[in-house]
């Protein structure tokens, strides 16, 4: 409310109160302006770590969208030092070798004394070569048979016999499993949109329309539907599921404008040594999505503070929600960014909070370096992290009573204290980390791809993308090469009939050696 002279009180104490209130409001507005300027013009990376050496993971705390922008902005800064010549890594032994001999002329193999020179060794220099993609046509020939003696009649059975066509991932199309796998990996693993792939094929003299390739992706994903049911079960088989979501624009959704925002969800779970990464397309950010995916699951679920996740514990008492220290830290970093230049180098409450978080991550670094087992990690945290957390909590309890609630510091403190019961649950299990980075890292390939293809042209395409991202990222997490896995999968899944057949095609049940042998024999 704007005050005029005739409405101002005469009491000096009331005037002082008005000035203080206005001053607080101005401070909040200035913070908001600086944060907006930082978002538009400033760098996206978080460089406010109190102790860089002790907090390696803290630089992973940005959301996936910000991390993608940060990767594009990185600059290499090399401090002064005595430069050592880097050693070149040897080329992989499994690559085929082609030998080219560079020998002297036979007339030069004579010594000055007249004797013939003997070969005493050789110098070998290996250089890397590449042959562009090899495209071939596979002709499927099915001989026809008929009796020339009686020529048969239809009532006695078929007059012409021919072998049935083999099951194919694209039954009536020209695409082989290898081609479908190549297109899928190029789009979903390498972020190469179909319109660019169309141009690449055109350079080889092959006319493949992008709409045709999009249809192949949908058909391939539909063929993998029974396999995805097993992927959902595998997701529930571990002690922890990390969840995150990111916007996706999908065109031609029934009853919705093309500008309406949809979402791609990601779930990271399954056995710790053979993780599952599951993508799920939805028109909504409602908590109904994680409730459906995690129905029947019992264990920890780590998320950010989005309110849609709160109903998980209510709908499923077996789920225990865990908070994310990444978001806590990000709120305090935002305060430093919002300071004016005069106050930027003056340590204050944000630096104190970041120091506490840095100490927590030093403990996590020790656990990684010692390669501790989950039970040993719990013991280490109980001994060293718990005292830090108690001290951090006591400091915040005291500080929040002295801080305006609407300012950035008040918001950061309130966020941390509200989430505190969930934040400290990582102490209970050695498989849990203090942050939700597993989900944010899992969703990053999709975010990179979205920057190139921008939107999905149809809900069927969005569902297909979710399926293929799930299979590719799960294969990568299990140590498999994405193309090799999809090539084998698309070759064998049309023949699968039982649950046992489908289960054998899960990334968790395959090894790199099996894939290499299959590709070599294909």
Q: At which residue positions do the language-model features occur?
A:
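Short, flexible loop/hinge motifs at secondary-structure junctions
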Residues: 1-174, 242-243, 249, 269, ...
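Catalytic center-proximal scaffold of phosphoryl-transfer enzymes
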Residues: 2, 108, 142-146, 151-522
């Amino acid at each position: 409310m704007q005050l005029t002279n005739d409405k101002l009180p005469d009491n000096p104490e009331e005037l002082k109160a008005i000035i203080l209130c206005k001053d607080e409001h101005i401070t909040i507005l200035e913070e908001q302006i600086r944060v907006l300027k930082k978002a538009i013009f400033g760098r996206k990376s978080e460089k406010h770590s109190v102790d860089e050496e002790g907090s390696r993971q803290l630089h992973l705390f940005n959301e996936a969208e910000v991390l993608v922008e940060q990767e594009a902005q990185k600059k290499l800064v090399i401090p002064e030092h005595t430069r050592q010549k880097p050693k070149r890594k040897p080329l992989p032994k499994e690559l085929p070798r082609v030998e080219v001999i560079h020998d002297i002329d036979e007339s030069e193999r004579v010594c000055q004394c007249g004797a013939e020179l003997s070969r005493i060794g050789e110098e070998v220099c290996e250089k890397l070569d590449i042959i562009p993609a090899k495209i071939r046509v596979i002709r499927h020939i099915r001989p026809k048979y008929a009796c020339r003696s009686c020529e048969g009649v239809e009532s006695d059975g078929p007059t012409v016999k021919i072998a049935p066509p083999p099951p194919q991932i694209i039954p009536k199309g020209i695409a082989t499993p290898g081609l479908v796998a190549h297109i899928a990996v190029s789009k979903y693993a390498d972020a190469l949109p179909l319109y660019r792939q169309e141009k690449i094929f055109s350079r080889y003299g092959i006319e493949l329309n992008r709409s045709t390739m999009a249809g192949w992706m949908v058909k391939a994903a539909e063929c993998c539907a029974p396999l995805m049911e097993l992927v959902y079960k595998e997701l529930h088989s571990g002690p922890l599921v990390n969840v995150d979501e990111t916007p996706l624009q999908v065109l031609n959704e029934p009853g919705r404008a093309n500008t309406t925002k949809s979402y791609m969800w990601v779930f990271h779970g399954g056995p710790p040594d053979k993780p599952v990464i599951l993508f799920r397309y939805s028109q909504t950010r409602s908590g109904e999505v994680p409730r459906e995916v995690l129905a029947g699951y019992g264990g920890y679920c780590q998320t950010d503070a989005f309110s849609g996740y709160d109903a998980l514990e209510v709908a499923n008492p077996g789920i225990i929600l865990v908070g994310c220290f990444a978001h806590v830290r990000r709120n305090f970093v935002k305060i430093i960014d919002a300071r004016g230049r005069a106050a930027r180098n003056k340590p204050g409450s944000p630096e104190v909070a970041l120091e506490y978080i840095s100490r927590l991550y030093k403990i996590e670094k020790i656990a990684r370096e010692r390669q501790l087992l989950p039970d040993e990690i719990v013991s280490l945290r109980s001994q060293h992290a718990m005292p830090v957390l108690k001290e951090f909590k006591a400091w915040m309890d005291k500080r929040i009573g002295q801080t305006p609630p609407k300012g950035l510091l008040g918001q950061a403190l309130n966020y941390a204290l509200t989430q505190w019961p969930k934040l400290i649950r990582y102490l209970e299990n050695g498989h849990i980390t203090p942050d939700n980075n597993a989900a944010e890292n899992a969703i990053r390939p999709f975010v990179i791809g979205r920057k190139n293809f921008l939107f999905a042209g149809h809900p069927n395409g969005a569902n297909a993308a979710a399926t293929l991202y799930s299979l590719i990222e799960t294969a990568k997490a299990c140590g498999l090469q994405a193309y090799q896995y999809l090539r084998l999968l698309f070759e064998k899944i049309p023949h699968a009939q039982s649950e046992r057949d489908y289960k054998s095609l899960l990334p968790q049940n395959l090894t790199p050696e099996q894939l290499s042998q299959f590709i070599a024999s294909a």
